[in-house]
């Protein structure tokens, strides 16, 4: 839920990047951090394992401007992609205002994408939410590498399996140099 602080005239929204392991969630935040003016961003916080895998979450605070006299702040989070961190995924989703699902475009990742979207549905349900109640962006990542599935095929597969039945206007994404 968007947090309003009328004392400081700030509005803060929580956006969560969700998806399977190694799909590029953390890379997205690194890229945004790199491309955002230093005076509009806070420090990026990453809790990673020794092999650079997200252990708990990544957090990137941004200031994006003023709306209606309120300073708008975004808190961008990632969830760990590994299934055994599901409790952490649920914790990070608590209070979510928007979700960016980062799907890996590689042929070998199709099942992992569908499984992760299904897991997102389950975790939202445990929080009393449905995906169609939360602003949702479906981002197809890694479009610049070989052995990728056409976006239309991935979208059709996800609709057929009812994990993203309302998904429209997919957002293909390439992060030059991997974003780091």
PLM-predicted stretches and their roles:
Residues 17, 101, 138-140:
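Structural beta-sheet core signal
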């Amino acid at each position: 839920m968007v947090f309003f602080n009328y004392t400081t005239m700030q509005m803060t929204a929580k956006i969560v990047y969700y998806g399977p392991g190694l799909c590029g969630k953390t890379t997205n935040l690194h890229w945004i951090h790199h491309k955002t003016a230093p005076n509009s961003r806070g420090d990026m916080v990453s809790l990673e394992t020794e092999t650079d895998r997200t252990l708990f979450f990544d957090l990137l605070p941004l200031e994006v401007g003023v709306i209606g006299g309120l300073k708008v702040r975004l808190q961008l989070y990632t969830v760990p992609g590994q299934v055994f961190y599901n409790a952490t995924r649920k914790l990070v989703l608590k209070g979510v205002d928007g979700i960016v699902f980062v799907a890996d475009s590689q042929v070998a990742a199709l099942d992992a994408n569908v499984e992760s979207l299904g897991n997102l549905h389950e975790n939202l349900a445990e929080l009393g939410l449905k995906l169609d109640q939360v602003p949702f962006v479906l981002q197809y990542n890694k479009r610049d590498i070989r052995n990728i599935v056409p976006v239309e095929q991935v979208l059709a597969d996800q609709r057929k399996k009812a994990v993203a039945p309302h998904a429209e206007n997919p957002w293909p994404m390439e992060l030059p140099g991997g974003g780091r």
